[in-house]
Amino acid sequence: MKKLIELKGVSRTYGNGDQTRTVLKNVDLTIVAGEMVAIIGASGSGKSTLMNIMGCLDVPNRGDYYIDGQNAACLSPDELARVRREHIGFIFQRYHLIPDLSALGNVEIPAIYANSERDSRRQRATALLGRLGLEGREHHKPCELSGGQQQRVSIARALINGGKIILADEPTGALDSQSGQEVLAILNELNRRGHTVVMVTHDMKVARHAKRIIELCDGEIIADSGGCVSATETLPKTNRIRQSYWKTLLDRTRESMQMALKAMKTHRLRTTLTMIGIVFGIASVVTVVALGEGARQETLEEIKSLGTNVVSIYPGQDLFDDSIESIRTLVPADANALAKQGFIDSVSPEVSASDNIRFLGKSAIASINGVGREHFRVKGIELLQGTTFRDDRNALQEVIIDENTRKAIFDNTGLQALGQIVFLGSVPARVVGIAKSNNRSDASNRITVWMPYSTVMYRIVGKPVLTGISVRLKDNVDNEAAISAISQLLTRRHGIKDFQLYNFEQIRKSIEHTSMTFSILILMVACISLMIGSIGVMNIMLISVTERTHEIGVRMAVGARRSDIMQQFIIEAVLVCLIGGALGIALSYITGALFNALADGIFAAIYSWQAAVAAFFCSTLIGIIFGYLPARKAARMDPVISLASE
């Protein structure tokens, strides 16, 4: 007969240095296919250690162990898992069922790790439970079954992948006499059908059910009744319908997610408290980004209304130059020279004054701006009615008023403003256009009018000098290069740099930089909150691994690879973080809606789908990173120690 199990000089020692204990000493043993063997011995004789080695849960320190012709010492942990999964079925004294799974779910576990097709394994598991007298009990949890029924579930689990070798550790130890006899009858029947059965027991009555009895004492075989194949049938090959890699991965992922949800449901409060850290962390990050974007957009809109490609030129070397009033070198000829430059779109000379505007007995203080014809293009001011000046050099008595002026002077008169003659101080002027008022809050009630710069210079101010020049640059012109060229041109004309240049693009960049710095600081605080929540996830996952050590041992015993265990716990961590991330994004949007409702138009929180996707990706990454250490710890557990932790 074929040698199925063969041990040659196997020894197993535990401990290091002087603190060592030898449990097995030079054990030689051969078991052929179809035998039913009982290994008997007192407590501490080494029989459980021998069974663990035969079941590829443990490895010897010395000697060789061959299972179905393969040297177990040469196999990797994943290859040992494959041997357990495909050749060995365990029946434990304490059943070792996973409490959160039904009887059917417990039986299916080895088949899941063997890549069996879902419907096929479910039919096979149902048939096994029915054959063992558990029909109608498939969906009961272990706590709803008697001890004998739980042991039958354990037997069905051992057979789901074929169970060429059945290793039974004290199979009747936790059962009453009747249930024990039923289990022994099942084992005898399995052996008759071709399964190789190895029982470990301390009870000679149980051992006598086997055809071969091996006695252990202090780690050595002291008696062996001799081999005898008792099987009367050849074990049929199990037909398993295997799935493709991707379908298998999907199946395992689904099973891991179900286990994760059950674990989260079992510890609702702990899961909720863990998730809160992720919820507030993600919510704070997304909200800070949205508020920062809203503030930035509002600031840019304000600056845009001033014209970011507009350069303003004023007399004096700086704002605190005491000689500004005496400088008379900024003249209309400078504006003409600038207008000839290829990088300039339009130019407007400027003269400022203030005086009363009067019409039919109505009077108001007006800000009078002497400007060129292209001023409205330079500043981007919209003309609602009428046209600009016919000419800006010949002191024409024309005026353009804004909406505030029209309301203050012409409302309730029943007259159209266009074409009417108004007085600016003592200078009469015809209204030729109406411009849109500045919508900034600081100018909402200001009355502003525009006249040709020559008119203001000669008829109102009486000085042939400008108070400023506004220049609009062409699109796609480098602002810094243009400002440098303007400065060089005016310096050559004046012989000295007696002017100052302002460009709102520089102001915009400065404000954007400041805003970005402030946003980054707040974002860092939000990220610290998220990091604290992430550490909480890792902490809870480590606790979960400790609490579920026994479950990990059971899964390893029935054939789970290290990667299977790692995947399960990483998925659980990712699931916690994903749910927390989704709730955090929802909380952020609710917070943004409340802010927009209560901010009274200061600025609005602006959300983007990119930020939401990034937050969702971030929560997934957190689950993977902070779930890795607990998952790695779970995957590296010793199955023997894990099984003993119940």
Swiss-Prot record:
Gene: macB2
Species: Escherichia coli O1:K1 / APEC
Record carries keyword Cell membrane: yes
UniProt: ATP binding residues: 41-48
Record's bilayer topology term: Multi-pass membrane protein
Name the record gives this protein: Macrolide export ATP-binding/permease protein MacB 2
PROSITE patterns cross-referenced by the UniProt entry: ABC_TRANSPORTER_1, ABC_TRANSPORTER_2, MACB
Any one GO CC term of the record: plasma membrane
Sorted UniProt keywords: Antibiotic resistance, ATP-binding, Cell inner membrane, Cell membrane, Membrane, Nucleotide-binding, Plasmid, Translocase, Transmembrane, Transmembrane helix, Transport
